[in-house]
Amino acid sequence: MRTCSSRPLVVFVSLLALNSCDTRPVNPKIDQIDTHTGYRFETRQVYREDHENLVILAFSGGGTRAAAFSYGVLESLRHTQLVGPGGNKIRLLDEIDVITGISGGSFTALAYGLYGDKLFDDYEQRFLKRNVQGEIFGRVMNPLNWPALWSRGWGRSEMAARIYDEILFNGATYADLNRGTGPFINVSATDITNGSRMGFNQSLFDILCSDLGAVPLSRAAAASSAVPVVLSPVTINNYGGTCNYTRPEWTQPFFESSDAPRPAARAIRELNALSDYRDGARRPYIHLVDGGVSDNLGMRGVLDALEILETFHDIGAPTPLDRARRIIIFIVNSLSTPPTDWDKHERAPGTLQVLVKATGVPIDHYSYEAVELLKDTMARWRMMRELRNSPAFTPGRDPVADAILRAPDAEIYAIDVSFAQLKDKNELKYLNKLPTSFHLPSEAVDRLRAAAGKIILESPEFQRLRNDVGATIVQ
């Protein structure tokens, strides 16, 4: 009898032992860099036919709220066609060149990059209307998974990545993403050691002497959405210094002078921070958390690129975007501001409430500043062009004035797709109450999708774009 009664315990312990063998995926090392291969913006240019317009979508963080809202933007662009003066119809969705994604927005960005139009067949059922949060919690609470969670380097985020892979990405890696012909997808996480923004693209992985192509998309999404404390950091290996990496030629002007060119000062600081990865012996591991910690809008890379573009124009150097006439940026911000009644009570809010608010407020303020910086850049370029084209200005008379007014010719369109742009105050109130989680009611998902399309069509900046290109909208 004693033998029979102990059998379940033996089986249970055996299963625990089997499950304790989980180890985190290791990004492979490369011995030599080839800048003409791998998943990077430069190699994706072969699929671009329209060099006059650069269309960028920036998807913010915010759990399923962000994933659904950004998906609504894709749906709207899918069903919106611009009809040019010649009668040719252009689907806005096909004009997208770059999508940046943070946290919840990274899922929609990566999934669209992988599946293209097929995403519209089942994204709702596979992800948006699924209790992803509950599935993660269920596995964490399953005793069979505890040994894996206790093992070195394999935490809750690795378990979440496995779930993301099962329900959405089907084992796809960046090599699979690179085989597609869609827009360049750049999702970001945050290096918790120094606070740097780390994008999942081969140009950055060159510094690590690592092959991004072997990295599962699910791990990139897990890193980008690894909310501190709630989920564990995602660890990647750094082999920097072992593959003869050198800085790209275009960065040399920024490092040859001790006085950083003003427009690109922030971008240069970011480049310097990334250069720190070249010493893999000193920093063999990089621990990544939610991308929203460093850039919740996915706009930092866009702003850096514009600043560098402006700096190149200042020094009279050519850039890959010199042919661009328009830079069109959809800032898809799912930030919600749930109302509180704290100020109506003498008793202060609890510790947990204060902690959540204290971490969110700086991120929200930084997001606001990022949008304003973009608008400042847009206004500055326009002002310099107007001065340069003014009858009062004579080119060649004053070299200093020529240099100051040497602004990029491209017109920037900053289309703000955020809850605050909704004219329906009742709908705004509803969306602002939605939590940041990976489980929302189906009704909430549908209303988020519908709101995104409505905001775009009613946007004054979108109407300006439509008028400037002389196109009409067909839905």
Sequence positions of predicted segments:
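Bacterial N-terminal signal peptides that target proteins for export
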Residues: 1-9
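Bacterial N-terminal signal peptides
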Residues: 10-19
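Catalytic domains of lipid- and phosphate-ester/thioester hydrolases
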Residues: 4-5, 20-475
